[in-house]
A protein has these predicted regions:
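Hydrophobic residues positioned within well-ordered beta-strands of beta-sheet architectures
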Residues: 1, 42, 61-63, 124, ...
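Compositionally biased, low-complexity regions
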Residues: 1-29, 40
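Solvent-exposed residues in well-ordered beta-strands and their adjoining turns
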Residues: 2-6, 66-70, 129
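Residue-level signal for secondary-structure boundary sites
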Residues: 7-9, 71-73, 134
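Charged, amphipathic alpha-helical segments and their flanking helix caps
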Residues: 14-25, 77-89
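Repeat-unit-sized solenoid/scaffold elements
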Residues: 17, 22, 36-38, 103-108
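Short beta-strand and beta-hairpin "edge-sheet" elements
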Residues: 26-74
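Intrinsically disordered, low-complexity segments enriched in serine, threonine, and glycine
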Residues: 79-220
């Protein structure tokens, strides 16, 4: 990294950046380096600064990066909306208070195709929104079901990589409901690539974000 400007300005910029690196380590939450639409999660282990070899009024910073999961990730998200009456009628909107605002009109719900352009199956996050009871989703023959009741403004998050299932109550309380997953087919089964058939009863909405992983990002 090369910093330009007056000496005091360069010092301030390096201090600010170092504070960000230190915060990631202290909170045990990796930061992200982006290349186009891909990112890799990492920590900055060490920093060295020196006078730039291009101009002596610039400062170079050399950083040592540690990637606990050394894969570049591109996220692909699709929302699956509930059918208001269960008969494919048009409905107006659902408004959730946690930045997942629905505002749409749509015909039948319950079966959708989703094309995932990748060379392998992918880990995912799945967010299931209430109100609903024992939500069940079929993806290419695999069953993803949680035996739990969700009220309005509650939702469940499934993380296939971390193997976690968390319920968020309307008041912001988080509950670990791992033990409420269905047995048999795994709710953590990776989602295959290609033309994917997704089926459910159409009575609730959910989002799926697949994590398309590569050892190096695609050249954009």
């Amino acid at each position: 990294l090369t910093f330009r400007g007056k000496l005091e300005e360069r010092k301030a910029m390096m201090d600010e950046l170092t504070n960000c690196f230190e915060f990631d380590i202290a909170s045990l939450k990796p930061g992200r380096i982006w290349f186009g639409t891909y990112y890799i999660e990492c920590y900055i282990k060490s920093i060295e600064s020196s006078v730039s070899g291009i101009r002596n009024s610039w400062t170079d910073m050399t950083i040592d990066i540690y990637c606990p999961y050394p894969m570049w990730i591109e996220e692909l998200t699709k929302s699956f909306y509930p059918d208001a009456s269960g008969k494919g009628e048009i409905y107006e909107y659902l408004d959730y208070p946690y930045d997942h605002t629905y505002d749409f009109s749509k015909t039948a719900a319950g079966t959708e195709h989703w094309y995932i352009d990748h060379y392998k199956s992918s880990n995912f996050w799945m967010i299931i929104y209430g109100p609903c009871a024992d939500p069940k989703i079929m993806i290419e023959g695999n069953t993803y079901q949680i035996f739990e009741t969700l009220e309005k403004n509650e939702y469940i998050t499934i993380d296939s990589q971390k193997k976690t299932i968390v319920k968020m109550l309307a008041n912001g309380t988080e509950q670990n409901i791992f033990y409420k997953k269905a047995t048999g087919n795994s709710v953590f089964e990776e989602i295959p690539a290609g033309d994917v058939l997704v089926s459910w009863n159409g009575e609730f909405g959910f989002d799926i974000t697949v994590r398309k992983e590569r050892s190096v990002p695609e050249w954009i």
